[in-house]
Amino acid sequence: MKIPHTLKTPLCLLVGAALIVPLRAAEKELKSAAVTVGDLGNPFFVQIARGAETKAKEVNPGVKFTALSSNYDVNNQTNQMDNLVSSGANLVLLGAADSKGIAPAVKRAKAAGTVVIAVDVGAEGGVDATVMSDNRQAGQQAAQYIVDKLNGKGQIVIVNGPPVTSVQDRVAGALDVFKKNPDIKILSQDQNAGGSRDGGLRVMTDLLTANPKLDAVFAINDPTGIGCDLAAKQANRSEFFIVGVDGSPDGAAALKSKGSLFEATPAQDPYAMAQKAVEVGAEILKGNKPESDTILIPVKLITRDNVNDYQGWTK
């Protein structure tokens, strides 16, 4: 009679397999979680890190937690991902510096058994799930505010940002609205301010020099918009208004400031977003996949009219 192939397996391999099974079972517990995001100098990403750490410690009080800033450098973030995986992180929340460029690092992490949740922005490479604001909705809300304020006619600029899906979706959402209003003239839409205050100041300074008359500015996030506002002050320009995205503390303060050109911001909730991402990741570690691999969190437009009722980000 032919001996079954499994019986030919050496005893040492069978013993090794017996040792591996409990190890894999133990890995289903959240033991080491990490976040890598674009810029921990941005309060938005600080809240993502805080929300993730709080939820991770709710899931497992003994969890090891790491938060890193990629500074929007995909090569830096690639190294961070590889180092996190090699150090034993079994859950990584990824705020991609480049949604396409980070794909190889995501694939390596997945191959090593690490659960990867894209947070705030999408990422290629086979992430387990994506948790982010409805960024297209944010762009649509911002653009509709501009159209309504200008009665459908005016000259505007879009101050763009890094090549990540959240920014791309916001701009696409804004263009959805602007294209329905042919008397809205977009004078610039491709200048990358890096998602930062300093970048907004730099790009807007150049745009003000190139455009002697503007009616409105759509900045892809609040730090960019605040930088644009500073550029306007330095150039002694005040004929236009600015709309951002985030609902950040600085954005809310700008809405309350009489001297600011900042007028509206679709509000996100980075703390709650990160908590949801950790919750989803912890369940995936247990073998429970979410009903949808993309979870979109609605945004709400905050303006000068309702900012006093705005409670701000979850803390």
PLM segments and residue spans:
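Bacterial N-terminal signal peptides that target proteins for export
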Residues: 2-11
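Bacterial N-terminal signal peptides
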Residues: 10-18, 22
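A residue-level marker of the well-folded mature domains of exported/periplasmic proteins
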Residues: 4, 24-315
